[in-house]
Amino acid sequence: MIRALSCVIIVSFSAFSCTKPQPIPKNLVLAHVGDKTITIQDFIRRAEYSIRPAYCRQSNYVHKKIVLNSLIAEKLAALEMKKNEDELLASSHFKSFLKGRKEQAMRQVFYHDEFYDAVTIPDTEVQDHFAMAGRTIQVNYLNLPDIKTIQKILELSQDNVSLDSIFKSLWEGDVPTREIRWFDREPEVIHGQLFQKELKKGQLVGPFKTEDNTYLIMEVDGWIDRPALTGKDQKLRWNDVRERLTEKTARSHYMEYVENLMAGNKMELNPDVFDTYATLAADYYIKDDDEKKDALNQAIWDQIEQPDVKNFKVNPELDLTATLFTYNGETWTIQAFNDLLKSRPLVFRKRKMNKGEFPFQLRLAVADVLMDFEITQECYEAGIDRNWTIASNVDLWHDAYASKRYIDVKKPDRDGVESEKELLDFFNPVIDSLQGVYSDKIVINMDAFEDIELTATDMVVTQKGVPYPIMVPLFPIITTDNRLDYGSKSD
């Protein structure tokens, strides 16, 4: 599962010279539904990267057929929605959402093909890290505001005063602790100092300057080594270590590329306008835990269906024509920047922050938007938008939402069809009918289908640090049919 996440989409630049979108390779197609396609990867991701309902959650063959029927039903519903002039499907918000999904996928393809796939890690390097890969280190840590305070802590530590004692003398309670594993994605400077053979218990590590200009210092409290004992475990760890080292090297090369790409570019904020913008934005982006939970539950489609809920952008205190910043001498008004955010939402490097920290974090987030803007232009110039995987990803999200709209429009009484059972009781015969109507337009690769093995693990897969973190749409709850008695088999 880890490998599937790190290699989001696998493509080759060799075919980017064509002017039309590439066709999907035949051996990767699981089913054709009219002019729509379900790839083998689509099937696996939709089944494994989101939580399936109880009626198809297991790994047996019957449940696997329900999964396939559900994904085909989603495509059928999307085909039916072509007959309707649906306001939301035609909305600018939905088009911006699809554009954002497309461009995020393009950047991920660019990273994978140009950097990740270009790295080769020799066996000797894997061997050097193999034993340490089973280590989990327990650390005490302090996050302090300035280097002077750090120096005082270091002086006390030289007198054998522990971080725990220092913390208790300054604050109440115990010193903060955490576990750090070799596979954790810590900054390389921290990872390198912790995971070395010469490490000792009680050793101070750091200080490290953080992105918010504070300083982190750690004290090693101990560690546990978990060796890989069986041949199977050793092989798995060997491959995981190679993958982690590949990712580390690729990320380093990628950051060098980005640094060179952005060299010479200059962003200048308009202080008065930015301060007002940041104050209003903080009320929108800084939420309590309950609000964050609700936001996650509604995260996929709210951008389309409720674009102006709690939206600071329509606040009368903001003059949308005011200059928010200049970038390379070009003026960016609040309106122009907000238009860009419709397809590339802000992503904050720091997940938890107070309002005092927000303006600085907002500056970083704005800079990251402009960085992605530049990378995206490079991707378009390279022709990545014409790769079949990009179009397939856009179609996946389009059809998932079209299917949702079909359910919303088709069910007789929105308030009367509430439960999952009531919804399925209504739509099962509807989907059965559509299977018959479209039967001659449905072709299934049964050999590929038989080869797929599913797990019964509940999981929602997300990505960190990207505008659209949810990997795949929610699983479609539209049919419980477990028969494949329609369509035809591919050759």
Language model: regions and residue ranges:
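Sec-dependent N-terminal signal peptides
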Residues: 4-13
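Residue-level detector of alpha-helical secondary structure
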Residues: 13, 42-49, 70, 80
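Peptidyl-prolyl cis-trans isomerase
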Residues: 19-38, 57-491
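Acidic/histidine-rich, surface-exposed loop or edge segments in extracytoplasmic proteins
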Residues: 28, 46-54
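C-terminal motif of bacterial Sec signal peptides marking the signal peptidase cleavage site
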Residues: 15-17
